[in-house]
């Protein structure tokens, strides 16, 4: 049997039932195609969600009341500008400028005060008092933007035992052109790249219990891997749930994440975020004109975007690389990148993640806590769809949470902490074996 990875397809349970299993050949538009068997009403919902995902929002007041309310402070004016073709963002644009897909998250260490504990319970972090939880690089008329992100890299050589050398780019992040005063010296800057919107309907169908079944916080099996779930606040449940989305698994549902992105990236209000993204010291932001409607993104539009993202096909993924798959297992990669889950509707999905948090070492620490995720802890990145990313974004792919890795090989070499043994084992492979493993990953 040559094929070792099954075709990726999405089955999403909605109120109307179960959609037919469908997939599409990897291409530039591979992440943007909808199911062919949607009903007329479902097509309307899908297209409504797609339109509000793609159209640019405008500042208030505007005659276009259906999509006004942008800002006053914001990073981008549409979802698609950070997720081109529904794929991930890049560090730089084709013109060499820092992409809008790169955002700077800001936070300070929590203390025992009631205010800080309330932040930690509902947001999972404590924002900077002046600049909030995320730097805004744009502002509407008469509202100064907060600042700009500056990235510099230092090339660090890594030598394999066989003498081969690979250079890693070590990033340094700085905020410049700050318009609201100096940044607090205790504020951490965590830079994140917009992720690809792959298989969100699948992830939604993985139960909390299925994820928790793989927890091993105390490493009772003594394999050096101690994954833990992130218990996070759910706006929908008004209580705690297992986080599945974002780089630190800090969000429990797709709809929660959509609302967070609207608030953080565009300062658009929803039922989950009722106020603009202004801090108490930003008077121009607080006094800026408001949209006609109290809620910029009403429930029906929020629901439509949620539906749109859950009814997208997944590119066909097959691998015939038996050697690469065997090495992936032998090195222990599959201990965290668990190949498959069974969903609530009994479909087995090949996702290559456990959705748990793992200590990835000091080199990848971003100084930021999100709920139970500590500074050097990250959610295991799902590996599905790698083979389609370059076609979808039209350029070379940047890997890891901040895009520092320019190749899958570099991404592996950044692994530390719980993944250090696997990385060291990879480094001791022959060049041909390393290439075989990387080829396998590139076909997922």
Q: How should these model regions be labeled?
A:
Residues 19-65, 86-90, 255-322, 339-342, ...:
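Post-cleavage N-terminal segment of exported redox proteins
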Residues 411-424:
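Short helix/strand-capping connector loops at secondary-structure junctions
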Residues 251, 255, 409-413, 438:
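An amphipathic alpha-helix signature
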Residues 188, 194, 203-204, 208-304, ...:
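Residue microenvironments linked to proteolytic maturation
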Residues 21-240, 244-247, 314-406, 410-413:
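Short glycine/threonine-rich turn/loop motifs
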Residues 2-10:
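Sec-dependent signal peptide recognition
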Residues 12-20:
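Hydrophobic h-region of N-terminal signal peptides that target proteins for export
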